[in-house]
């Protein structure tokens, strides 16, 4: 596709689910977008198996972008990402795993990738409601374009995965990126507990607890966190590695 794409292209984009007739087109697009070769069974699954959310963005009838994701129970998360959610979440808590998100080169920077990602979020909110606590994906450590895209949409690096990919016989490193939704969060670290306690103490009036105890606790926490004023903490920011 080499046509000049107008700035108003997004207004002409339609969304629809992938179907079996799209297999050849999807194979061609994935060959252009990704260095990984997928088996034929993968293409059959994402275009017919209802466990996948497979959405195409079309422009004047042609597929110009797509997103494929699987919404599954946290018990089905692979071992390397098993700590995406804290252990206190129930076993029927769900996560959404993005297998693929791509846009035809000429149509990039027109908001189509964002539209597809937002459509996944909308789908989760209507089907999984608040049971889905995280959206995650894997990306090559060298894919700066994709990394910037996800980081600009509040995904956080959760894990570094050495030798995660095998591309044409060469092992490549990957990252796991996660977006927490509906109150989802990773396991807390010691620092998280300290920050949370600091926030709670800072919200108390010294008159409500013995003044000496308050001052000692406040000084102790400041010694752990010399770079930040505890009184300014209003919450916890989670960040890990993909």
From Swiss-Prot:
GO CC annotation: Golgi membrane
Binding site for substrate: 38, 99, 165
Record's note on what induces expression: Isoform 2: Imprinted. Promoter methylation of the paternal allele may restrict expression to the maternal allele in placenta and leukocytes. Isoform 1: Biallelically expressed.
Membrane spanning residue stretches: none
Recorded superkingdom: Eukaryota
Consequence of changing residue 36 to A: Reduced acetyltransferase activity
Consequence of changing residue 83 to A: Slightly increased acetyltransferase activity
Annotated phenotype, changing residue 37 to A/F: Only slightly affects acetyltransferase activity
Reaction catalysed by this enzyme: N-terminal L-methionyl-[transmembrane protein] + acetyl-CoA = N-terminal N(alpha)-acetyl-L-methionyl-[transmembrane protein] + CoA + H(+); L-lysyl-[protein] + acetyl-CoA = N(6)-acetyl-L-lysyl-[protein] + CoA + H(+)
Consequence of changing residue 79 to R/Q: Increased acetyltransferase activity
Positions that bind acetyl-CoA: 101-103, 109-114, 143, 150-153
Outcome of swapping residue 143 to A: Strongly reduced acetyltransferase activity
Cytoplasmic side: 1-192, 237-242
Membrane disposition: Peripheral membrane protein
Annotated site location: Required to position thioacetyl group: 34
Result when mutating residue 19 to S: Does not affect localization to the Golgi apparatus
Location(s) in or outside the cell: Golgi apparatus membrane
Sequence ranges marked intramembrane in UniProt: 193-236
Effect of residue 131 to Y: In IBGC9; uncertain significance; decreased activity of N-terminal protein amino acid acetylation; when transfected RPE-1 cells, does not affect subcellular localization to the Golgi apparatus
Result for mutant: residue 140 to A: Decreased acetyltransferase activity
Subunit structure: Monomer and homodimer; monomer in presence of substrate and homodimer in its absence.
Role: N-alpha-acetyltransferase that specifically mediates the acetylation of N-terminal residues of the transmembrane proteins, with a strong preference for N-termini facing the cytosol. Displays N-terminal acetyltransferase activity towards a range of N-terminal sequences including those starting with Met-Lys, Met-Val, Met-Ala and Met-Met. Required for normal chromosomal segregation during anaphase. May also show histone acetyltransferase activity; such results are however unclear in vivo and would require additional experimental evidences.
Record protein name field: N-alpha-acetyltransferase 60
Organism: Homo sapiens (Human)
């Amino acid at each position: 596709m080499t046509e000049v794409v107008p700035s108003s292209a997004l207004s002409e984009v339609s969304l629809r689910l992938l179907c079996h007739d799209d297999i050849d087109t999807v194979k061609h697009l994935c060959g252009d977008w990704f260095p990984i070769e997928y088996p034929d069974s993968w293409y059959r699954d994402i275009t017919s198996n209802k466990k996948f959310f497979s959405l195409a963005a079309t422009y004047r009838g042609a597929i110009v972008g797509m997103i494929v994701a699987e919404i599954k129970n946290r018990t089905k998360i692979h071992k390397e990402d098993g700590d995406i959610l804290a252990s206190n979440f129930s076993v029927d808590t769900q996560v959404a795993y993005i297998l693929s998100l791509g846009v035809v080169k000429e149509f990039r920077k027109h908001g189509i990738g964002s539209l597809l990602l937002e459509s996944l979020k909308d789908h989760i909110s209507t089907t999984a409601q608040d049971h889905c606590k995280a959206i995650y994906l894997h990306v090559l450590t060298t894919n700066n374009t994709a990394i910037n895209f996800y980081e600009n949409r509040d995904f956080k690096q959760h894990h570094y995965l050495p030798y995660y990919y095998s591309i044409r016989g060469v092992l490549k490193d990957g990252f796991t990126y996660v977006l927490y939704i509906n109150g989802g969060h990773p396991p807390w670290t010691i620092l998280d507990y300290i920050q949370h306690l600091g926030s709670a103490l800072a919200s108390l009036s010294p008159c409500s607890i013995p003044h000496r105890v308050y001052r000692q606790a406040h000084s102790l926490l400041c010694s752990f966190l010399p770079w930040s004023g505890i009184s300014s903490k209003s919450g916890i920011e989670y960040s890990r590695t993909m």
